[in-house]
Amino acid sequence: MGIRYYRPYTAGTRQKTSSDFAEITRDRPEKSLVKAKHRAKGRNNRGVITSRRRGGGHKRRYRIIDFYRNKLGVPGTIATVEYDPNRNARIALVNYKDGEKRYILHPRNVQVGTTIVAGPDAPIEVGNALPLERIPLGTEVHNVELIPGKGGQLARAAGALAQVVAKEGKMVTLKLPSGEVRLFQKECYATIGQVGNVESNNITIGKAGRNRWKARRPKVRGSVMNPVDHPHGGGEGRAPIGRSGPVTPWGKPTLGYKTRKKKKQSNKLIVRRRRRSSKRSRGGRQS
């Protein structure tokens, strides 16, 4: 993938960049692997907003992705590389030898015509899926299962990868994209290689309208609201928030406040915590 730059014909194109889509080989999805997608626009079943700043955006159809990779021992050939509006990674259509078709996340540098296979005896090649116990130390993987048979849940975004760093007994240690080092059951499956479209993080939106196409609505600072709408609101002109630290619209501490349960079961599987976010609690920060 490359990044396309634009001449500043308008204010919206001055800073804008986008993908050149050079890796895309087909512009229409496989009909049998597409279904309608209802978008909740941030509302729950009662119509109450539970996730702010969602709504609008372009209509999408959902591509059914095979995160399970459970066609063991059946080879498949990469037929196409396609755009998926529901994720920043590309997807690849796989034609299996038994006639079935499935979409998978497109691994980096995998070309049309490449043969892939899943199973404990699969070769260590990019695009193949194996149990973690069969993957050599130092190997980069993606689409990692948290629970055997549940399907890949980790390292699925564009450019994401995890690394196998140790094996001991029934557990395998992986370093995740967040920097967290965590234990996994050795039976969990993962796919060899890195997710494609690695330049996705370097794209500049350029104008507000592109975010609206993605159903992302504007984010209003609490400090410019009225007191009835936000704890940071009110005051004459640009007033401080009047608290020891920033809070959410419902009065809960935010920006650096730990929300993970202290007695969560999976705590014992975490060897090293993820890197701390740059959004830490500071007096002048607004939410």
UniProtKB/Swiss-Prot annotation:
Gene3D superfamilies named in the record: 2.30.30.30, Nucleic acid-binding proteins (2.40.50.140), Ribosomal protein L2, domain 3 (4.10.950.10)
Keywords (A to Z) from UniProt: Ribonucleoprotein, Ribosomal protein, RNA-binding, rRNA-binding
Superkingdom: Bacteria
GO cellular component, as recorded: large ribosomal subunit
Biased amino acid composition, Basic residues: 209-220, 258-287
Record region (Disordered): 209-287
GO molecular function: rRNA binding; structural constituent of ribosome; transferase activity
GO BP terms in the entry: translation
Role this protein plays: One of the primary rRNA binding proteins. Required for association of the 30S and 50S subunits to form the 70S ribosome, for tRNA binding and peptide bond formation. It has been suggested to have peptidyltransferase activity; this is somewhat controversial. Makes several contacts with the 16S rRNA in the 70S ribosome.
Assigned protein family: Belongs to the universal ribosomal protein uL2 family.
Subunit field text: Part of the 50S ribosomal subunit. Forms a bridge to the 30S subunit in the 70S ribosome.
Protein name (Swiss-Prot/TrEMBL): Large ribosomal subunit protein uL2
High-level lineage: Bacteria, Bacillati, Cyanobacteriota, Cyanophyceae, Acaryochloridales
